Amino acid sequence: MQSTAIVFQQPKSLALTGLSLPEMGAADVKVEVEFSGISTGTERLLWDGTMPAFPGMGYPLVPGYETVGRVVDAGDQATLKVGTRVYIPGSQCFQEAKNLFGGSASKLVVPSARALPIQESLAEQGVLFALAATAYHAHSAPGTKQPDLIVGHGVLGRMIARLAVLAGGHPVVWDTNPARRSGAVGYEVIDPSTDTRKNYKCICDVSGVSSLLDELIGRLAPGGEVVLAGFYDTPLSFVFPPAFMREARIRVAAQWSPPDLAAVIALAGDGLLSLDGLITHRQDATQADAAYRTAFGDADCLKMVLDWRQVT
């Protein structure tokens, strides 16, 4: 079996390439991909070659962990039926390239447990579940606070704000880009230069800007917390006395876990978590090179979705 996949051959160089799929196991499903999202966080670092080294890192690679498709074949022990629309957070099904994270392809073979059923009506919005789960993970553990300041109004920042409002919060969001200050429902987005507050109890940073830590610590109330929920490609540091005076806490929010993903799928399915207004750009998967350059170079692009429905 063959699949057409996006392959990063090296930084800033990609091609649509035919790759072999493995034979299906008894508990596997074959999925024809309908949509995949382009991540402007980790995937951007893979694209431009600035991803810090980690085990398994290298080129060529198949990117993607935001995939929506439909089950077209299922093994005897698979838990999903043919025809089910699913979300897949990446795959490990390609041998001719590294799977980082292996979801941007026309067809995938994955364990049925890795393909999560989603509401039929969500369609392309299903690609947003990885970001939604990341947002949920940052502030859902027992004892964690909802943020009263969120730094960055991209898709992840908007997800965190929507979840905070859903939990009864009233967050403020910073964004330096005037074009990114629209789209708020139930919270306020402001230019950080106009904010004089220095009593935030919980600040969640999703900007990925390593140099902001001193500024954020200076905005904390005593005993306040900075949550680092972005991805940072350069070292972070901070001046100690202001953090000491506030007895500041710094917490790293890593990627989501399976319960986080299940939680946001349920919230969206119940109509509690809106995914509207977050996908701004769409491109046929055959135009992937142009799509990636738009996703990473156009400040007006919140989320780019690739349409695979015409790709074999």
Place the predicted regions along the sequence by residue:
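A short acidic, Gly/Pro-enriched loop at the edge of an enzyme's catalytic core
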Residues: D195-I203
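Short, well-ordered coil/turn residues at beta-beta hairpins
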Residues: F35, P89, C204-V206, W308
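Short acidic-hydrophobic, aromatic-tinged amphipathic segments that line or gate anion-handling sites
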Residues: E188-T194, R282-Q287
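Glycine-rich beta-strand-centered segment in the early N-terminal region that forms part
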Residues: P22-I38, T50-Q92, S121
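C-terminal hydrophobic helical "lid"/dimerization subdomain
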Residues: M1-S3, L166, D214, P258-T312
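NAD(P)H dinucleotide-binding glycine-rich loop of Rossmann-like/cofactor-binding domains
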Residues: V86-V151, A161
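Mid-domain Rossmann-like dinucleotide-binding core that forms the NAD(H)/NADP(H) cofactor-binding site
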Residues: Q125-S193
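Glycine-rich phosphate-binding loop and adjacent beta-alpha segment
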Residues: S210-D270, W308-T312
